[in-house]
Amino acid sequence: MSYPASIYNATTLKQEIFSKLRLQKKKELLRDVEALKDYTLHIENGEHVGVIGHNGSGKSTLLKTIAGVYPVVSGTVDVKGSIHSLFDLGLGFDLESSGRENIIYRGLLLGATPAEIEAKSQEIIDFADLGEFIDYPIKSYSSGMLVRLAFSVSTSLTGDILLLDEVVGAGDASFMAKAQRRMKELMNGSKIMVFVTHNTTLVQQVCNRVIMMDHGRIVKDGKPDEVVAFYKKAMCAP
C-alpha cells in the first residue's frame, strides 16, 4: 500500500487538513511512499492481534490504515464493523475551549452522535476526575490532565474493532489503576483487537495471534509464543 508523501508531514489536525488541500492542487508535484508492502492480512471475529517490530517497521502505519486515517493510493482495505481507535489521543482538541466543550469535539471526531456524547458526558467527567478544571480552557491543563481527559473520552465509546497503539500512561497511580482496568474491559469486550506494542510480555497475555513487521512487511504471523520467540531471536541477530 502507498500513500501521498505529504501525509507524513501532517502532525496536527490543521496541518493534515492543509496537506489534503495542497494534495488536491498539486498532485503532479507529489510522489507516493510505499509504506506497507506485499502482504494480505485477514482478521476474524474473536482474534486479538498483537503487532510487534522495531521502530519504523510499519506497525502504526498498519493501524492507521485500518482506521482510515491515511488515504490509500494503491491496495485495498475492507473493514466490516465499527472502529474504536485509541491513538493520537489529543487529536481534535481546541486549546481555547473548556474540557467540557472538548468532550463534544473529541466525541464527534470519534464518530459519536451528539445524543451519544450527551449520554456519556457525565461518565467521562467523573472518570477524568478534573474537578472544576473541566470548565477551564484546556490550554491551562498540565500534560497529565490533558491525557486523562483524552483517555476518558476515547475509552467511553465502543466499537466492534478496537485499534490500540501502546497502553496509555495517564497520570498518577490512582488514575493509572482505573485506566488499566478500563483497558482490560475494552480488550475483553472487543470482537476484534489490533494492538501495536513493544511489550512482548503483555502481547502474550492479551493476544491470541501476533504478527511481526519489518520494513513495511509482515515477516511472521502466528501464535504469540512462537512469534515473540522469533522476534527476540531476530533482535539479537548481528
Q: Where in this protein do the model-derived segments appear?
A:
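Pre-NBD coupling/linker segments of ABC/ABC-like ATPases
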Residues: 1-34, 225-229, 233-236
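Conserved ABC ATPase "signature" region
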Residues: 14-21, 104, 116-133
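The feature captures the beta-strand-to-loop junction immediately N-terminal to the Walker
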Residues: 52-54
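H-loop/switch region of ABC-family ATPase nucleotide-binding domains
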Residues: 197-198
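A short, surface-exposed alpha-helical micro-motif characterized by mixed small hydrophobic
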Residues: 203-205
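Conserved ABC ATPase "signature" C-loop
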Residues: 215-216, 231
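ABC ATPase "signature
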Residues: 221-222
